Amino acid sequence: MSEIKIINGQSLPNIPWQERPADLEEGAVLWRYTENPVMGRNPTPKIGRIFNSAVVPWQDGYIAVLRGEQVNGVPHVYLGRSKDGIHWNVDRERVQFVDENGEPWMPNYAYDP
């Protein structure tokens, strides 16, 4: 890319990046990583697939909030951690929520982060 524009923010250090494919449709601003999927099936015994991750730099690597579809098909929110943004370790337990009184609360269905 000959010119990079940051809108309302600063550049994020060490974000994994692949250059724009030469055959990408004119005007397209997003493209898939050629090695997708980054996270394969069954990243933990209870999770069948990962969808719609929200990833940010954190400490000496990256942290992600993930929608993990459990093997029974019900989605819940999980955390993942990575040193390089490509290889991930996903927590085995779901994110624990609390209600407005600080009491433990677990939704029956937790979709996108």
Task: Report each predicted region and the residues it spans.
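Beta-rich carbohydrate-recognition and catalytic domains
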Residues: 1-111
